[in-house]
Structures are given as C-alpha cells and as structure tokens.
Amino acid sequence: ASSWGGDTTEGMTDEGTLLAPDPARKIIYTADLSLESTEFDSASASLLDALAQAGGYVQSSESGGSTEYGRWVRWSLRVPADQYRSFLTAAENSASRTSLSESTEDVTADYVDVEARLNSLEAQRQRLEELRAQAANLEDLLAIENQLTQVQYQIESYTGQKRVLDDQITYST
C-alpha cells in the first residue's frame, strides 16, 4: 500500500485508508500518468482545462504522430500540491488510463538543514558587518570584506536551494 504513491506506507491507517499528510512535512509529489483516447483533440482540451482549473501550468510539451497513424503528446505539468489528487482524478476522467505511477519524496530534513544554514549565515553576516564598522585598519577591513563576500555567496547559494525546494513542494509534477 502506498501513501499518495511511492513505496512507503507512511500516511496509511491499519485499514489501508489514506491519512491527511502532516502539513509540517515537506513532501514533493510526482506522478507519471499515461492516457489514451480515440478523441485526441477533445481529450487534450479536457486535460488542459482540468490543469487550468487546478491552477497548474505546462512546464514542457512534446508531440508527434499524424491523424492517419495516431497522434501523441507528452506533457510535463506542474500542479499546486493541494490540487494534486483532484487533478489526477480529473485527468483520468479526460481519457482512458493506461498506466499511473506515483512517488513522494520527503525533503523535510533537507529543507530544515537549508533553513538552519541560512540562519547561521545571516547571523555570521550580521556579526561581520559589525566588525567591519569597527575595523581599525585597512588590512582588517579587507579581510572582513573578503569574509563577507564568501558568506554572501553562501547565502545566495542556499537561498537558491530553498527556492528550488519550495517550488518542488508547492507544485507537484
């Protein structure tokens, strides 16, 4: 049994029913859904309408084939995590499901680690700025400026990592 997909039973009761995910956890939801339909245009339109209603967007698109031999499309769709389950249901109603695989990734520890590092670096930057204001000579000032530059680089790097995690958590794929 799985909780929102994947290979885990986390989030399941003894009876096998889903529990609401812990809002404090930072979970990335991913699904790979294959659909088929003899009505390509209407199924595609229905799926894109469900995506718009869920507040999602097309991240990438690839299509091919012909009306004579069959057309296909492969989309990478981003859906707000709180709309993930209802969007999958709507998507499955737009055509016949041929396969579905789902996975989850709990990135709570990574997220907490990035936040802790950012807090530590912000405190370090503040202390270095205080020291810079008290620098007695040019040599000390240059050394402090060098350290500030390194700390700022690390802050920007961790801020970028946090933004990526936030995006992956907020929008399921």
Where are these regions (language model features)?
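Soluble oligomerization/assembly scaffold segments of membrane-associated complexes
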Residues: 2-172
